[in-house]
Amino acid sequence: MASTADFKNGLVLQIDGQLWQIVEFQHVKPGKGPAFVRTKLKNVVSGKVVDKTYNAGVKVETATVDRRDATYLYRDGSDFVFMDSEDFEQHPLPESLVGRLADFLLESMPVQIAFHDGTPLYLELPVSVELEVTHTEPGLQGDRSSAGTKPATVETGAEIQVPLFINTGDRLKVDTRDGSYLGRVNA
């Protein structure tokens, strides 16, 4: 059990038999009336996001989530195989659990896998990864009135929007949370 004072991003709550992760929270102290906590919760199984408000000081049930360091090894059909960094046990995760994060997975990449009662819940990647552009159209100077972007395919097969000056073979830093271009990596 945890109080609303213990809320933090990433905390997993158990509500009506389902696991919900706190994505955002805000303590609100209105001038009139009792304080409360406004939260944005994400269902760890379905990914559904809901807003929920708690009165300050309310106790809620938390779930024990074990985050383990692992390394991505390879893809086997529709499963992604990861090796636990502590006991070297291999964990195949289904494509449905990995989701769009598959666009940024590289072999030997360090990740974290969250488990609840021995069952994998979700995968966490580093905030940014370095990927090589395998294909993009050349950007022409002077063909636009303002700064623009173009699609580029990176080594994992994902397509991201990049500035016009990016060429095939460039290494990019990409945000794994939303797939956005962060910058070019100097070789």
Curated annotation (Swiss-Prot):
List cellular component terms (GO): cytoplasm
Checking Gene3D superfamilies in the record gives: 2.30.30.30, Nucleic acid-binding proteins (2.40.50.140)
Biological process (GO), any one: peptide biosynthetic process
Q: What is this protein called?
A: Elongation factor P
SMART domains linked to this entry: EFP, Elong-fact-P_C
Cross-referenced PROSITE patterns:
EFP
Which InterPro entries has this protein been placed in?
Elong-fact-P_C (IPR015365), NA-bd_OB-fold (IPR012340), Rib_uL2_dom2 (IPR014722), Transl_elong_fac_P/YeiP (IPR020599), Transl_elong_KOW-like (IPR013185), Transl_elong_P/YeiP_cen (IPR001059), Transl_elong_P/YeiP_CS (IPR013852), Transl_elongation_fac_P (IPR011768)
GO MF term set? translation elongation factor activity
Keywords attached to this Swiss-Prot or TrEMBL record, sorted alphabetically, are: Cytoplasm, Elongation factor, Protein biosynthesis
> Which pathway does this polypeptide act in?
Protein biosynthesis; polypeptide chain elongation
Main location, first listed in the record = cytoplasm
User: Where does this one sit in the cell?
Assistant: Cytoplasm
KW Ribonucleoprotein (keyword) present? no
Task: Tell me the organism.
Answer: Mycolicibacterium smegmatis (strain ATCC 700084 / mc(2)155)
Q: Does the keyword Lipid biosynthesis apply?
A: no
> Could you say which protein family the record assigns here?
Belongs to the elongation factor P family.
User: Which Pfam families does this entry report, sorted A to Z?
Assistant: EFP (PF01132), EFP_N (PF08207), Elong-fact-P_C (PF09285)
What biological function has been recorded for the protein in this entry? Answer: Involved in peptide bond synthesis. Stimulates efficient translation and peptide-bond synthesis on native or reconstituted 70S ribosomes in vitro. Probably functions indirectly by altering the affinity of the ribosome for aminoacyl-tRNA, thus increasing their reactivity as acceptors for peptidyl transferase.
Please name the NCBIfam families in this protein's record.
efp (TIGR00038), PRK00529.1 (NF001810)
